[in-house]
Regions:
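Surface cap/lid and interfacial helix-loop subdomains adjacent to catalytic sites
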Residues: 4-159, 164-166
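Extracellular low-complexity, Gly/Ser/Thr-rich intrinsically disordered linkers
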Residues: 142-198
């Protein structure tokens, strides 16, 4: 849609950003523009507009395998982008995750997570887990991915790991990473970024 209906047209200046969670967006190696989107660069700062943000999430302790589907492309002259909505300029940053409080989050299970050790009832539709996750874009095993660190504290009553892996019984599909919660991990960061981009867009008199 961006390449065919937006780039090179007046509507391109009206786009704050395209947030393409869990998607391989290709650029020439070492560049922030080209290949998939010829005129739409990667967002590298919060006040940038008419740009693209894309990421694929993996546990820091379980990076993408060499045969993984995310974070890489077959052509060695190209690579996928990684832009963390919580820190577009790079580096490790706390991400502000928001999860649905009901039904299975991502492990393809039917039961809801136990958000607290005493399984206290949750009455809100979403759950925040402040400080539980931090993430940064890294290159590992030839893949550019969002590496997710879990800051679990076994001593506190809160859930230590929400899940998000693709599982088939006991088997974990490592090449999928945390694809099922790509959006949830940075949900509030995406929401918070929009008014910043909107203010920048208005300031330019678009």
């Amino acid at each position: 849609l961006i390449a065919e209906e937006i780039e090179g047209k007046p509507t391109a200046t009206q786009m704050l950003s395209a947030m393409l969670a869990g998607t391989n967006v290709t650029v020439p190696k070492g560049k922030d523009q080209g290949a998939d989107f010829k005129q739409t660069p990667v967002c590298r700062k919060a006040g940038q507009t008419s740009c693209v943000i894309a990421w694929t999430s993996f546990r820091e302790t379980s990076p993408p395998p060499a045969n993984g589907r995310y974070g890489r492309v077959p052509d060695p002259a190209h690579e996928t982008i990684c832009a963390n909505p919580a820190a577009l300029g790079g580096g490790m940053a706390t991400v502000n995750a928001r999860f649905p409080s009901g039904a299975g989050i991502g492990d393809l299970v039917a039961d809801s997570p136990r958000w607290t050790k005493d399984n206290a009832p949750i009455t809100t539709p979403t759950v925040a887990v402040p400080g539980l996750y931090a993430a940064q874009c890294v290159t590992v095993n030839g893949a550019n991915v969002l590496s997710v660190r879990i800051n679990a504290d076994p001593a506190d009553p809160r859930i230590d790991d929400v899940g998000g892996d693709v599982r088939f019984g006991a088997f974990v599909a490592q090449d999928w990473g945390l694809h099922l919660i790509d959006v949830s991990l940075v949900m509030q960061d995406m929401v918070d970024l929009v008014p910043v981009q909107l203010a920048a867009w208005k300031a330019r008199g678009r």
